[in-house]
Amino acid sequence: MASPKETLQRRAARVRRQVKAVANGRPRLSVHRSSKNIYAQIIDDVRGVTLAAASTLDGDLKGKLKTGADSAAAAAVGKLVAERAVKAGVKDVVFDRGAFIYHGRVKALAEAAREGGLSF
């Protein structure tokens, strides 16, 4: 039987493989969630560069949020990363949730990014 860590790694690899299959050169919106914060970045895998990034640790958000570990904070990060991506000229992305299920904070970030101007 696989350990929990191995299960997460397999799920992340499976999702990443699916994302790359449908990407067609589009950058990906990668999400990482920890117990206290949430991070998002737009990555261009073709060139190997990060085009935009945001997290609950950003100076723009840190003082405004009650905590970095709730859906409101995730929505603020989604809106901020979308704003920065549009400023960088990126509107079409592929959503990469990693090993995290599309629920709660990950879903709040994705919906806020869509409202902010990203399409996926």
Curated annotation (Swiss-Prot):
Transmembrane segments: none annotated. Keywords: Ribonucleoprotein, Ribosomal protein, RNA-binding, rRNA-binding. InterPro entries: Ribosomal_uL18_bac-type, Ribosomal_uL18_bac/euk. GO terms for cellular component: cytosolic large ribosomal subunit. It holds the Pfam family Ribosomal_L18p. GO terms for molecular function: 5S rRNA binding; structural constituent of ribosome. Belongs to the universal ribosomal protein uL18 family. This is one of the proteins that bind and probably mediate the attachment of the 5S RNA into the large ribosomal subunit, where it forms part of the central protuberance. Part of the 50S ribosomal subunit; part of the 5S rRNA/L5/L18/L25 subcomplex. Contacts the 5S and 23S rRNAs. NCBIfam families: L18_bact (TIGR00060). This is Large ribosomal subunit protein uL18.
